[in-house]
């Protein structure tokens, strides 16, 4: 062993012991003939003092610079009174260095690693990720990630789950996003697909009698990136047999409660369970942030006969929605703020943002301030009564197709909640349940809200007769407005699976071509089963307070799915393409 202790693990318990440390020079200071080195390793920092009484060590220390890799042997002693550092685990002690060996020198890093206040571009950090990881902030996040996965494994092991690996090279199946395709050299002209999830394989494991499965799985989706999306991501994938949806939610809730309690010291009460219809009605989102105490109120029925077309049109449209958002005590918002909110909802397709300021409600219309009151005067007081408006409030309105209203007003609710500091608590977990089985596309076809293997609450006959009315036995875990996990019970009979494919417009021939292995499995006695998948990266992001999942992944991709460190993706040699039977088509040149 080259070392006896980690730098960050030294405490007063080691006083008067001789220790050997290995690590990097975090910071070097020369004070009046005494050299101080802050030594850093994975566990933290410790101060090393080298004085002229050890001439050889002092001469070596005089030449070292930041990020040199050193091996230091010395004696642990208590710091002099007044020089302690309460911000460090090792802040009560220091190491009096006796021997120093330079294991590796370092050039000056492209950005400082010992100053968290330096503003470094993300692309620069990713290009030199091997250096960025040395920063204590990044090391802490990766260490925390390891603790999370270790606790999850232990929890699932204790509850009888088996860790089973599923294939990375598989075939393309319709799961919503584009697949990453891998050409086969042996089967020329054919392609593997990297898995978007282990969904079908974990269902087959249940048919195989595994009973309880889990895997911390790599998944791949070729989709547009956002702050919480990556082309490759990690999923805590879980499947069980002979449990109902309540059992699965209780099991996964228990795991989440344990994570937050043991790693953050946060104790959760029983998670609320909210139907999808309630979430959309009150919060215009299927992942509501319950820390914000604002709710939407439907008012379309009051607008049926108004002459104001902005409201009358959506009120009479079966696919329209008019929703009011009352913000208590915000009637003093300046016009500039309202204009900014109007621009904000425009991002989501809203054509404007109507509002009413309630100054003195007892004066009726005269006590209101709004450019729209004159158009809805006959029903305005009834409207304000429905939303519970009081003096000093402002009420915003969204009127359009339901999707536009939900997207715009749901986002506005969250933005206003944060802008006006209305957040009532630090954490608000819940389950959203009773999702629709299908949603209608613009061309009148049905598509799965989750995936085509989700079990409906309806019978086969009802699914065929009224697919739009079918609810699924699906459940999403939502934390602070972010979906951290989602799952469902699965279809386990051939008859129901064929009925769902039929509703989705998947012919028998297409089903056999793409899913013959699943349909075959359902012919041989599949158990009732269901599961869930957590987005590990997203969960770690929330628990650490990181602003992006890129900050909790060792080697992430950029928003354009590139790796600045390795320059991936990159062109390949012509002979490699020839072996795969691939010829690249020349792309038209972009005009200047």
From Swiss-Prot:
PROSITE patterns: AA_TRNA_LIGASE_II. It is found in: Cytoplasm. One of its GO terms (molecular function) is ATP binding. L-aspartate binds at residues 175, 221, 450, 490. GO terms for cellular component: cytoplasm. Residues 199-202 are annotated as: Aspartate. Aspartyl-tRNA synthetase with relaxed tRNA specificity since it is able to aspartylate not only its cognate tRNA(Asp) but also tRNA(Asn). Reaction proceeds in two steps: L-aspartate is first activated by ATP to form Asp-AMP and then transferred to the acceptor end of tRNA(Asp/Asn). The keyword Protein biosynthesis applies. Keywords: Aminoacyl-tRNA synthetase, ATP-binding, Cytoplasm, Ligase, Nucleotide-binding, Protein biosynthesis. It comes from the Bacteria. Its EC number is 6.1.1.23. GO terms for biological process: aspartyl-tRNA aminoacylation. ATP binds at residues 221-223, 230, 483, 535-538. Homodimer. It catalyses: tRNA(Asx) + L-aspartate + ATP = L-aspartyl-tRNA(Asx) + AMP + diphosphate. This is Aspartate--tRNA(Asp/Asn) ligase. Belongs to the class-II aminoacyl-tRNA synthetase family. Type 1 subfamily. The record marks 31, 82 as: Important for tRNA non-discrimination. Disulfide bonds: none annotated.
């Amino acid at each position: 062993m080259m070392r006896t202790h980690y730098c960050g693990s030294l405490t007063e318990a080691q006083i008067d012991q001789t220790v050997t440390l290995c690590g990097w020079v975090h910071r070097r200071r020369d004070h009046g003939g005494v050299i101080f080195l802050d030594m850093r390793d994975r566990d933290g920092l410790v101060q090393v003092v080298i004085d002229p009484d050890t001439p050889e060590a002092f001469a070596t220390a005089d030449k070292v610079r930041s990020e040199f890799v050193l091996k230091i042997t010395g004696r642990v002693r208590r710091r002099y009174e007044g020089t302690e550092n309460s911000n460090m685990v090792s802040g009560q002690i220091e190491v009096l260095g006796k021997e120093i060996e330079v294991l590796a020198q370092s050039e000056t890093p492209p950005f400082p690693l010992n100053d968290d206040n330096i503003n470094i571009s993300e692309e620069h950090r990713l290009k030199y990720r091997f250096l960025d990881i040395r920063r204590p902030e990044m090391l802490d996040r990766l260490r925390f990630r390891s603790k999370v996965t270790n606790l999850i494994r232990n929890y699932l092991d204790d509850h009888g789950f088996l860790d089973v690996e599923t294939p990375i090279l598989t075939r393309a199946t319709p799961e919503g996003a584009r697949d990453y395709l891998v050409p086969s050299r042996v089967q020329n002209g054919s392609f593997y697909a990297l898995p978007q999830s282990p969904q079908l394989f974990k269902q087959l494991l249940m048919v195989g009698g595994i009973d309880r499965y889990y895997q911390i799985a790599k998944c791949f989706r070729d989709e547009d990136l956002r702050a919480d999306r990556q082309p490759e991501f990690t999923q805590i994938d879980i499947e069980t047999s002979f449990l109902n949806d309540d059992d699965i939610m209780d099991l996964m809730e228990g795991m989440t409660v344990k994570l937050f309690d043991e790693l953050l010291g946060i104790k959760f009460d029983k998670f609320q369970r909210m139907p999808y219809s309630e979430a959309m009605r009150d919060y215009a989102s299927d992942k509501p942030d319950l820390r914000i105490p604002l709710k939407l109120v439907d008012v379309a029925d009051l607008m049926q006969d108004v002459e104001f077309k902005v409201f009358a049109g959506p009120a009479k449209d079966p696919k329209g929605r008019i929703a009011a958002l009352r913000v208590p005590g915000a009637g003093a918002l300046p016009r500039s703020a309202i204009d900014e909110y109007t621009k904000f909802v425009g991002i989501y397709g809203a054509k404007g943002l109507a509002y009413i300021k309630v100054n003195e409600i007892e004066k009726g219309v005269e006590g209101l301030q709004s450019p729209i009151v004159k158009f809805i005067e006959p029903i305005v007081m009834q409207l304000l009564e429905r939303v519970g408006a009081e003096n000093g409030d402002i009420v915003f309105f969204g009127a359009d197709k339901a999707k536009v209203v939900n997207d715009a007003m749901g986002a506005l609710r969250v933005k206003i909640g944060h802008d006006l500091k209305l957040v009532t608590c630090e954490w608000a977990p819940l389950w959203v349940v009773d999702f629709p089985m299908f949603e209608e596309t613009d061309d009148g076809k049905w598509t799965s809200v989750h995936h085509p293997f989700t079990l409906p609450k309806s019978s086969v006959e009802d699914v065929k007769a009224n697919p739009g009315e079918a609810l699924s036995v699906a459940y999403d875990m939502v934390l602070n407005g972010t979906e951290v996990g989602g799952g469902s019970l699965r279809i386990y009979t051939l008859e129901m699976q064929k009925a769902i494919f039929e509703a989705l417009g998947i012919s028998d021939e297409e089903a056999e071509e793409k899913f013959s292995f699943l349909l075959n499995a359902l012919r041989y006695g599949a158990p009732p089963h269901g599961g869930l998948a957590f987005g590990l990266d997203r969960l770690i992001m929330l628990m650490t307070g990181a602003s992006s999942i890129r900050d909790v992944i060792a080697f992430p991709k950029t928003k354009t799915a590139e790796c600045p460190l390795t320059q991936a993706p990159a062109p390949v040699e012509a002979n490699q393409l020839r072996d795969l039977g691939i010829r690249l088509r020349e792309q038209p040149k972009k005009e200047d």
